[in-house]
A protein has these predicted regions:
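Intrinsically disordered, low-complexity, basic-enriched segments
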Residues: 1-85
Length: 85
């Protein structure tokens, strides 16, 4: 999936949870949503993008600050577990 599409999807999640009065709860909500509903390959692509662009800036698209913080703080949990054959 193209990174711009993933950023736009993640930003919509961030905009939803931004309305929460408790920032920590909002960060947890973003991370939980991405963990539960994004396929492992989508999470891998987003994490790989952040390896290349830690500020979340893709040039034409930029990660919402809440999403950037949520993914960065929960990177280990969001990293898909490799299956052993």
């Amino acid at each position: 999936m193209e990174i711009g599409n993933l950023i736009r999807m993640a930003n919509r999640i961030g905009q939803f949870f931004e309305a929460m009065p408790d920032r920590q709860e909002a960060l947890e909500g973003v991370a939980n949503h991405i963990h539960k509903f994004w396929e492992p390959r989508m999470r891998n692509e987003l994490l790989g993008f952040l390896d290349q662009s830690p500020d979340g800036d893709a040039g034409t698209e930029r990660l919402h600050p809440l999403v950037l913080d949520a993914v960065t703080q929960n990177r280990q949990r969001l990293t898909p577990i490799a299956r052993v054959a």
